[in-house]
UniProtKB/Swiss-Prot annotation:
Keyword line: Cytokine, Disulfide bond, Glycoprotein, Growth factor, Secreted, Signal
GO function terms (MF aspect): cytokine activity; growth factor activity; interleukin-7 receptor binding
UniProt similarity note: Belongs to the IL-7/IL-9 family.
Cellular component GO terms, alphabetical: extracellular region; extracellular space
PTM summary: Three disulfide bonds are present.
Gene (name only): Il7
Organism: Mus musculus (Mouse)
Function: Hematopoietic cytokine that plays an essential role in the development, expansion, and survival of naive and memory T-cells and B-cells thereby regulating the number of mature lymphocytes and maintaining lymphoid homeostasis. Mechanistically, exerts its biological effects through a receptor composed of IL7RA subunit and the cytokine receptor common subunit gamma/CSF2RG.
Cystine crosslinks: 27-145, 58-133, 71-116
Domain of life according to the entry: Eukaryota
Subunit relationships: Interacts with IL7R and CSF2RG.
Residue stretches in coiled coil: none
Null allele phenotype: Deletion mice appear healthy at birth and develop normally. Both sexes are fertile. However, they exhibit severe peripheral blood and tissue lymphoid abnormalities showing a strong dependence on IL7 for proper expansion of lymphoid lineages.
Entry protein name: Interleukin-7
Length: 154
């Protein structure tokens, strides 16, 4: 008898707990029409893209960040939130004051627009050697994700 109740109590519930998502961040995109994106964020992303130069000498290998975090149909806002947090690491590059202003505009503006209520579960790892190739790819992915969101809302 004890064995049956043990299986009932401890057998099924752990399976349910395993199947539930570990963290559910509530993110709601505020401006789906894209006015704030087009008038502020897109301009700063383009400026940052110009400042970082060409990516012709960047390797084709995909960083772990992009393997773990993708802008798919259900997680656009969560991806943008993580990417915006990752951008803040590049303030340490100290390229120029203008670069830092645009970087903060994109990072803080994106976080404001995606409006995530829960805090991230762990700190973002330090980007190795302030990788300019990673920054260029991150900016491109942020821009692509915003464009995907805006096309889906039309």
């Amino acid at each position: 008898m004890f064995h049956v109740s043990f299986r009932y109590i401890f057998g099924i519930p752990p399976l349910i707990l395993v199947l539930l998502p570990v963290t559910s961040s509530e993110c709601h995109i505020k401006d789906k029409e894209g006015k704030a994106y087009e008038s502020v964020l897109m301009i700063s992303i383009d400026e940052l893209d110009k400042m970082t130069g060409t990516d012709s000498n960047c390797p084709n290998n995909e960083p772990n960040f992009f393997r773990k975090h993708v802008c798919d149909d259900t997680k656009e806002a969560a991806f943008l939130n993580r990417a915006a947090r990752k951008l803040k690491q590049f303030l340490k590059m100290n390229i120029s004051e203008e670069f830092n202003v645009h970087l903060l505009t994109v990072s803080q503006g994106t976080q404001t627009l995606v409006n995530c209520t829960s805090k991230e579960e762990k700190n973002v790892k330090e980007q190795k050697k302030n990788d300019a190739c990673f920054l260029k790819r991150l900016l491109r992915e942020i821009k692509t994700c915003w464009n995907k969101i805006l096309k889906g809302s039309i």
